[in-house]
């Protein structure tokens, strides 16, 4: 009975234990249900606090019987459970209601970058495949999506560039301050709430705000540069191509369309060079250093072009040197903006204010009644002489001209060339691009006098007059040089043979025939977008009578003029064939009646010109910061094709010159390996130096790239390294100068003196022969002759040369037994030479790095070789295929093996032998036959 009662008590205890476990489980479930219900009804801090309080109450009532230590442990567990339930509101996946609630509260979303769209990754997608699909690089996708790894999972949403939006508009969200970044995972966000106290205070998910100085705002490091350049070859012309510069290599690929590439092939011009072989890199503004690359330092001229370094680089403060590249970019950008504003601002001496410009009136140029020609009369100024008053028409044109379209203009250069540039700009004030044209008359003082150049483009001609004095003329040219140097437009150079006017006060205007200019006029007048032809007849003419102009130095230029709305001509004076120009006075332009064989003979052209200018006078608004566009043409004596702007876009500014000095010649990227080696050996004597013409716009990029990736290379000279490169020929010349005996006069000597001198000079030669003599053999060999010994001694390894040879074993003395050979070689500790003579009197053998001995495996090193004198002396060294050098057995001795064949095999009696071709030495058969009979055998050691 007692046992039954004890069993019942134990059973009750067990039930109470499981009951307690069940109660704990129910308590946890109830706590979760309460927290979920409270999260639906409440939000924010109240939810967290209510959940915590309810759970605390429930747990206290359920666990009241336990000790204080258990309460402390349970309390810590409760805090952990609280933290988990709190975070379940944000990371719950199964509960749809919680998910919708989370979407409302969760603000940790990545801002969508501009110009991108969302793409959901599939099961087969990788970052590389997605990048290839949208034509971007994987690194760009990582940067756009703020990824921490290149691994993506199916269903992941990525931002990819939108094909409908240009790539230039794509901006990263990190570039704007305050952009939020998504967490990498839920675990990362979970770690941001370490305990329940922070969970109570968490009103919303934690988000990371990027500051404007964050590292992610900085653009990625430039890993390579790609630019168009021209390569100056060594006597094979100048070739255009693409240069790619990386931190490890410099490559140049020529354009396939280049004439030299078409003629000679791309193998001659493709280059590649590792950055480790580059000795020096330098940028110059001219090629003066190219001409003196082989000159001695003492012969260098003093006016060499200095090494290029940005001006702002030296002005950087110490705090900016921490990251000089980004600071330099910002400084350079500010300078470019200032230069752009300076080009828009005109000189106060040559441009009037808007208040002063209101005094200007419209002046018409009216053709005579009896002719359709323009006639030139004396120019009269309302203010007196034009030399004393400012050039009113010039000022009006400067203020009135607007960058309305691409206009072709010839600008005077510094010395003896004319630049033909194509100025591109945006239309303003509702002016049509087709209304931009030019006509100009300019001087040719040194040749035949002034010539007329007229050009029209895209349907309309705008004409104006400009009166300039000598001073204003020079100011205008300076302003033009400044403006055109700042532009990035085409400027092919054209030769001319005329100089600047020297005595403008006494000059006269004469119109002469010029066939090239007439062709130019006809080309531009016929170049209409609608296909209409403005000028139909362009005839050759020469004006014999020359009208003199009132003194004052006048340069008449017909240019486009856009007057203000208030300066429009009177309504009653709108006549066909009348051209209105801006000016301070009436300037009638007429030609001499004797010149009736004309330059322009079409009244319809004049009517269209007048009507178009009349409309523009009403519609156009004048801008006081407009640029001036003039034609300063002296004389064109080149074909018309040479002065027309080319289709490909070129930089107007002159290029910079990149000089790359390398340790050895660059490799030809398109040539074969053999041709490349021949080319390198052929040019080894020359100083390897390569020159490239690079655009000036990319010079700062090149400089920054080289300073960043190879700071020790840029600007380093050979003399800074402690040595001067001297060609081999110069060294030979110096050596020969001191080695050759000095020239002496003829002298007669006796025979005894001649013999004495001969014996004295040959003393050292005999000593050298003794030094290079045969090694000492102890005793004399019965098989080897001096010829054999000499040839063998030359092929022995260096560690045994010079030692006397000692005979260790000979069949004549010790008998024919392999065991005896092993016994005699046991005391040796040096390489041995095996010499065999067969019954055919053929001598052959082997050199072994170790003495012959009994062994269970092959031994020896790669210095082991086989040799034969049958019929000529040959040595077969180790091929490297295997290491079967020497193997000593009781029944045989083997040297070389592989494939069941031995290079040299001897039996136990040293009587029979065999020689085959083996893979160890790739040797021939050493004897005349594969099987041979040994006549004599010797083993020599070196001591």
Swiss-Prot record:
Post-translational modification Phosphoserine, affected residues:
92, 182, 186, 211-212, 214, 442, 498, 500
Q: Describe the location of the LysM domain by residue ranges.
A: 117-160
Location, primary (coarse class): nucleus
Region (Disordered) residue ranges read 1-83, 169-189, 334-369, 486-507, 543-576
GO CC annotation:
nucleus
Q: Which InterPro entries does the UniProt record give? A: LysM_dom, LysM_dom_sf, TLDc_dom
Which regions are flagged for Basic and acidic residues bias? 1-15, 349-369, 486-499
Q: Where in the cell is it found?
A: Nucleus
Entry keyword rRNA-binding: no
> Which tissues does the record link to its expression?
Highly expressed in brain and kidney. Weakly expressed in mammary gland, lung and testis. In brain, expression is found in neurons of cerebral cortex, thalamus, hypothalamus, hippocampus, cerebellum, striatum and choroid plexus.
Which SUPFAM superfamilies does the entry mention? LysM domain (SSF54106)
Which residues lie in coiled coils? 1-32
GO BP terms, alphabetized: negative regulation of cellular response to oxidative stress; positive regulation of transcription by RNA polymerase II
* Pfam families in the cross-refs: LysM (PF01476), TLD (PF07534)
Look up keyword Transcription regulation and say if it applies.
yes
Going by the UniProt record, its keywords in alphabetical order are: Acetylation, Activator, Coiled coil, Nucleus, Phosphoprotein, Transcription, Transcription regulation
Q: Where is the composition biased (Polar residues)?
A: 177-187
Phosphothreonine modification sites are: 137
* UniProt modified residues of type N-acetylmethionine: 1
Instruction: Tell me a Gene Ontology molecular-function term this record carries.
Output: transcription coactivator activity
The UniProt record lists the TLDc domain at 782-943
> Which family does the UniProt entry place this protein in?
Belongs to the OXR1 family.
* Function summary: Enhances the transcriptional activities of several nuclear receptors. Involved in the coactivation of different nuclear receptors, such as ESR1, THRB, PPARG and RARA.
Quaternary structure and partners: Interacts with ESR1, ESR2A, ESR2B, THRB, PPARG and RARA in a ligand-inducible manner. Interacts with the heterodimer AHR-ARNT.
What is the official name of this protein in its record?
Answer: Nuclear receptor coactivator 7
Q: Which organism is it from?
A: Mus musculus (Mouse)
